[in-house]
UniProtKB/Swiss-Prot annotation:
Pathway of action: Pyrimidine metabolism; UMP biosynthesis via de novo pathway; (S)-dihydroorotate from bicarbonate: step 3/3
Origin organism lineage: Bacteria, Fusobacteriati, Fusobacteriota, Fusobacteriia, Fusobacteriales
Organism from which the protein derives: Fusobacterium nucleatum subsp. nucleatum (strain ATCC 25586 / DSM 15643 / BCRC 10681 / CIP 101130 / JCM 8532 / KCTC 2640 / LMG 13131 / VPI 4355)
Keyword vocabulary terms for this entry: Hydrolase, Metal-binding, Pyrimidine biosynthesis, Zinc
E.C. numbers: 3.5.2.3
Protein name per its UniProtKB record: Dihydroorotase
Catalytic activity, reaction form: (S)-dihydroorotate + H2O = N-carbamoyl-L-aspartate + H(+)
Length: 425
């Protein structure tokens, strides 16, 4: 496959090149590659970069295929420019043993159009009491997490970190102290009071991060914080890094894009976990990106049925979809307004992910895996969930206009998504 007339970023400047793909690798990147026997695709001077890597998606299968399937989720991710994703273990059965993990791996092998690497659960059934069969499943999982809930026992988390260090696997944490949730459904603040909805305080997240950073130091383990949302959490991670502790973290697009003030009414589409916090918290997240405290962006793509999201904030399920719109929303909100550079954004979604988790992906260079996304930076669409490839339509960003639309995604040398109106084969 030969991609002609590509525009790539090199040393902060655009260069026009051709990219030759053979098998699953990038064989050559050069001006004017002239090979006639290849499948030639004219990219028409669109932006080309390494495929995005998302370390936080809920693909819902096995167990919850009413919400999403591997088939639909992988195509949605490819449409958003993702070529590698890591799937969360809050499934049925939970991947906490070789047998249960294999059920998920079989579905991925059969139905996914992109590279998908499962997480293993930290604890059996994600109950937080007894460690899963971590040693037995380590070779086939990306890392370990009980995402969807916090590990409440410090001792269980410490034992998990000791095992993670032994296996050279990260411990990835959804940080939430159950004793501080107090029946809340959105951020505890002025807006929750105005809407008459019980709130979840920021300390519900940040206190568990502080605990875990110290445990990670004691265990000498790579500790990664999921979907950071509060200013105190950013501070805790920043201090951990300053002290040489192996702590990294991610932020979601929606926590960068919005805050609780954007919730104008009691609408379950705005319910997510962690919740959208204050304007001050959102600003702290942006500063955390700019100063390097926050390492990467991950979507926390969490599809639900419409029935689960139309019950108001208190009774709806937590979660928002993001695979198909993440890059475009961030490009529109932050790159077009000169808050982030284009180079910074693509690194946050690809190269940085590969770097902190030591992955052989996230590079657009010769001999690297042919994981590529072609983006039309000028193309504008209006977000319409009815057009999503995901089964999940649960987004509050309906009718938002966005630029920077992926039109071709190649994962491991194979076309995973193509906009046939924009790209001619």
């Amino acid at each position: 496959m030969l991609l002609k007339n590509c525009k790539i970023l090199k040393n902060t400047k655009f260069e026009k090149v051709d990219i030759l793909i053979r098998d699953n690798k990038i064989e050559k990147i050069s001006e004017n590659i002239d090979i006639t026997d290849e499948n030639i695709i004219d990219i028409k001077n669109r932006f080309v970069t390494a495929g995005f890597i998302d370390v936080h998606v809920h693909w819902r299968e096995p167990g919850f295929s009413k919400k999403e399937t591997v088939y639909t989720a992988s195509r949605a991710a490819a449409r958003g420019g993702f070529t590698t994703v890591m799937t969360m273990p809050n499934l049925n059965p939970v991947p906490d043993s070789v047998e249960t993990l294999n059920k998920q791996l079989e579905i991925i092998k059969k139905d996914s159009v992109i590279r998908a690497i499962p997480y293993g659960a930290i604890t059996k059934e994600e109950y937080g009491r007894e460690l899963s069969d971590m040693e037995a499943i380590a070779s086939n999982v990306f890392a370990f997490t009980d995402d969807g809930r916090g590990v409440q026992s410090a001792n269980v988390m410490y034992e998990a970190m000791l095992m993670g260090a032994k296996l050279n696997k990260a411990i990835v944490a959804h940080c939430e102290d159950n004793s501080l949730i107090r029946g809340g459904a959105m951020h505890e603040g002025k807006r929750s009071a105005e809407l008459g909805i019980k709130g979840i305080p920021s300390i519900c997240e940040s206190t568990q991060i502080v605990r875990d950073v110290l445990l990670a130091e004691a265990a000498n383990c790579h500790y990664h914080v999921c979907h950071i949302s509060a200013k105190e959490s950013v501070r805790a991670v920043r201090e951990g890094k300053k002290n040489g502790i192996k702590v990294t973290c991610e932020v979601t697009p929606h926590h960068l894009l919005s805050c609780d003030e954007d919730i104008k009414e009691d609408n379950g589409m705005w319910k997510m976990n962690p919740p959208l916090r204050s304007r001050e918290d959102r600003n702290a997240l942006i500063v955390g990106i700019l100063d390097g405290t926050i390492d990467i962006i991950a979507t926390d793509h969490a599809p639900h049925t419409m029935e689960e999201k139309i019950r108001g904030i208190e009774k709806s399920s937590f979660g928002i979809v993001g695979s198909e719109t993440a890059f475009a929303q961030l490009y529109t909100k932050f790159v077009k307004t000169d808050i982030f550079s284009l180079e910074m954004l693509v690194k946050l979604m690809s190269e940085n992910v590969a770097k902190i988790f030591d992955l052989p992906y996230g590079k657009l260079e010769e001999n690297s895996f042919a994981d590529i996304v072609v983006i039309d930076l000028e193309k504008e669409i209006t977000i319409n969930p009815n057009n999503f490839l995901s089964k999940g339509k649960n987004t509050p960003y309906i009718n938002e206009k966005i630029n920077g639309i992926p039109v071709l995604t190649i994962s491991n040398g194979k076309i995973a998504y193509i906009d046939k109106e924009e790209i001619n084969l």
